[in-house]
């Protein structure tokens, strides 16, 4: 009888635990390369390359610790003017991704092919598989800032791509 009561107690506790909702929150920051023109003063340059809140950045949440096309996005968050975002989730394993992670990494490579863009295909593949952040949620969680970089003359904030062409007019 005591084993049955213990089992019922444990089942009750696990259903309460797995029914809970937790908040996953964080911030997004972006840095931008200085892309030429008249050289700015050191103060202006420092301000230009300093991390800024990534307002309007759209993030998606997928189940599992790795990105996969088989896993559909289960939630979306848009960063506010301070770069803050949040998701409400049940306990489990998750992967935070951005729009480019919702299609194949091969399509990203294909879209970025240009005589002036150098693409590190292995780097793109690893970035795509790992997503922006993988985590196991067991309680309310605040992440370290997700950091993005906009390189000169490259599409979006995808890493592993470098522009090698002439300065645009």
Residue ranges and their predicted role:
Residues 67-82:
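Short, acidic Ser/Thr/Gly-rich low-complexity loop/linker segments typical of extracellular
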Residues 1-4:
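Positively charged n-region of N-terminal signal peptides that target proteins for export
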Residues 10-11:
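Short, linear, compositionally biased motifs with a strong N-terminal bias
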Residues 19-65, 71, 101-169:
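Primarily secretory-pathway and cell-envelope proteins
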